[in-house]
Amino acid sequence: STRAVMYGPVNRADYQSLLFRGNCISTSTTFIETELLRSVNGFDESTEIVTAEDYDLWMRLAATKPTTVFIPEILGEFHRLSNSASSAVLRNLSSEKAVLRKHFAEQSASVLTRLRQRHRFAIADYGAARQLTSQPVQALKLFASSIRLSPFVFKIYPAVLILIFNSLIRRKKL
């Protein structure tokens, strides 16, 4: 399937937003000054963050407070093959969480920060669950994890109901 995504806006590209709200930067349409890229040692090629190394790089770059500009146009597209979607989603979730743990280790240990961290992990699980709705059992496990981590992410609840409803309809058709 093909999906069009508009990245940005620029006010979402600062370090705290990238950390607590997620990635809003596309690798395929990004230009970075060589010296800036070198100053943060480029991509981290650690195996635990493969598929999310760009997200890690954006956060390390954002920590330097560079000038960031977004072009308000769709500049590329990507294709997801359904036969590999599940393993890719779960691998990306694992990598995203590894990046988050890496950057959270540098944050304060205040109660508010820990709550925000739990919320961010919940959003990661929620996002993966939304991508796995064709596999209701796996999606429900991720939605449940998301609710356990941060029960006040209210958008989870309608997503769970829709998943259950659609699963019941699919079952009746069989």
Give the residues covered by each predicted segment.
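Conserved nucleotide-sugar donor-binding catalytic segment
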Residues: 2-91
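C-terminal subregions of glycosyltransferases and related glycan-biosynthesis enzymes
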Residues: 68, 74-174
